């Protein structure tokens, strides 16, 4: 029995010596083919952008376009009206100076006629009918020594004209020019028209008719 056991142990030892020991584990080498795989890694797709067309309906887009069209039309209308008003006003201003000149000319003529009708001077025949006298003959204690129109002193040979009624004396040329523009005496402002007491009736009637004709003209 002991021999059998020993023989069994020997045979087992041989079998163990025949079995080669396991080789040590080899180090793991990095495979360069795995890097492209990492580089080809793609991130997850981003979330889709919101669809604004979905937010604005077809009716809203149509209304927006319609509002833009109306605004452009209103601007064009305002521009047209403004330009038309500008050109019309410019034409009126260009034609107004000639019309203003015509109106002022009419007013001037009308005013001139009114002055002639209201404050006329005396006609030449009436002025020449007033008496002429030398200063040396008319000189007296109450006679003025100078002309009230030109303020020039009288001399003995100066020819003067005497107005009727007031009997004021003036230089001939001074009083004739005055009476062509004014029908009154420059000193007392009375009318120098002759009266029936100082002038014969034959001279008064033609004189009155000439004055009336002058006023009517």
UniProtKB/Swiss-Prot annotation:
The RING-type zinc finger domain mediates binding to an E2 ubiquitin-conjugating enzyme. PANTHER family: RING-H2 FINGER PROTEIN ATL67, RING-H2 FINGER PROTEIN ATL70. This is RING-H2 finger protein ATL70. A zinc finger (RING-type) spans 147-189. The chain crosses the membrane at residues 61-81. One of its GO terms (molecular function) is transferase activity. CDD domains: RING-H2_EL5-like. It catalyses: S-ubiquitinyl-[E2 ubiquitin-conjugating enzyme]-L-cysteine + [acceptor protein]-L-lysine = [E2 ubiquitin-conjugating enzyme]-L-cysteine + N(6)-ubiquitinyl-[acceptor protein]-L-lysine. Belongs to the RING-type zinc finger family. ATL subfamily. PROSITE patterns: ZF_RING_2. Pfam families: zf-RING_2. SUPFAM superfamilies: RING/U-box. It is found in: Membrane. One of its GO terms (cellular component) is membrane. Pathway: Protein modification; protein ubiquitination. One of its GO terms (biological process) is protein ubiquitination. InterPro entries: ATL67-70 (IPR044289), Znf_RING (IPR001841), Znf_RING/FYVE/PHD (IPR013083). Keywords: Membrane, Metal-binding, Transferase, Transmembrane, Transmembrane helix, Ubl conjugation pathway, Zinc, Zinc-finger. It is a single-pass membrane protein. It is an enzyme of class 2 (transferase). Its EC number is 2.3.2.27.
